[in-house]
Amino acid sequence: MNRTDELRTARIESLVTPAELALRYPVTTGVATHVTDSRRRIEKILNGEDKRLLVIIGPCSIHDLTAAMEYATRLQSLRNQYQSRLEIVMRTYFEKPRTVVGWKGLISDPDLNGSYRVNHGLELARKLLLQVNELGVPTATEFLDMVTGQFIADLISWGAIGARTTESQIHREMASALSCPVGFKNGTDGNSRIAVDAIRAARASHMFLSPDKNGQMTIYQTSGNPYGHIIMRGGKKPNYHADDIAAACDTLHEFDLPEHLVVDFSHGNCQKQHRRQLEVCEDICQQIRNGSTAIAGIMAESFLREGTQKIVGGQPLTYGQSITDPCLGWEDTERLVEKLASAVDTRF
C-alpha cells in the first residue's frame, strides 16, 4: 500500500508537556499574585478607569537571557520611578513571525544555528519569565500559535495577536480563551477594521480543538475575553496621527466597544526606521497633552544597545543588541519614558 501521510515530514521529536515544564519551573505564590494584580491594573487602564498609560517596551525579540535580565532590572527602576503615571510592562517575545523565512525566535531555535532544540527553548522562555516576574516586572508577548502559549501564558500579563494573524479565526478563538488582556494589531496594509472585528470575535464564546496542559487533545469551550483592544501599528503609511486614532475610535463606537487603544511606535509607524519611534513619541505626547483619552497605551522596541546585528556563524554577538528589528538604545529609552510620564501628568 502506498503511504499517503507524513510524506514531507523530515523529523519528529517528543515535546515536553506544559504540565511537565510547569513542574520544573513552578509559579510561586508571589509571582501568581504579581501576574494577577498587573493584569487587573492593565484592564483598568484599557477600560478608562485608570488614567495612567500602559507602556509595553523591550527588545524586538529575546535571544540572550543575561542581557534580557539586565534590561529587566533597569526597567524595574523606571517602573518604580514612574509608577504613578505609567504601567511599564516588558516586551518578552519568544516567537517571531517571518514575512518569508528567518530566525523564528528563542523557543524554536535557542542556539541560533538551525538546530531547533525546542524543548530547551521552552525551558529558557519559562525560566526567564519567572525571573522577570520575580523582579516585579510584568511581561508581554505575542501569541503566535495554538500550542506554545500553553507553556507560558500563566506568566504573561498582556498578550498581542500580530498583524499577520489578527484576521485568523483560530487566533481570535485563542484570544477568547486567554486569561490576560489581548491587543490585536491592524493589518499589514494599515486596515484597523480587521482588528475591531477580531475584538468582537474574541469577546464571544468559542469552541476549538487544542492540546491541554498534559498534551491530550481537547475540546475547549471559552467564555470570551472582554479586554481585547486595537494596536495601531501602521501599514503602508503611519496611522498614529490624531485623525487616524479618531477614525479607529469611530469604528469602536459603532460597535459599542471601549474607545481606548494602544499605539505601536515601531513597525509601520516608524517605517522601519527605529529612531523615528522618538518622533512618534513626540506626536503621541502632544495628543495626550491636548486631552486625548483614547490613547491607553504604547508599544516601543528598545534594548541595551541601539540598532541590530546579523547572526554570523563563528562570530560573537554584540551584547545587548537586537538580532531582529533594530531597537532604541537605553539612553533613548530613558528619554522616551520620561517624556511619556511628563505628558501623562496632564491627565491628573
Where are these regions (language model features)?
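Internal helix-turn-beta structural module
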Residues: 303-346
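Histidine-anchored nucleotide/phosphate-binding helix
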Residues: 68-81
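Gly-rich Lys/Arg/Thr-decorated short loops/hinges at beta-loop-alpha junctions or inter-strand turns
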Residues: 17-26, 222-234, 317, 321
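Acidic (Asp/Glu)-rich catalytic clusters
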Residues: 46-49, 79-83, 129-136, 221-222, ...
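Conserved, mostly hydrophobic/aromatic
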Residues: 58, 263, 329
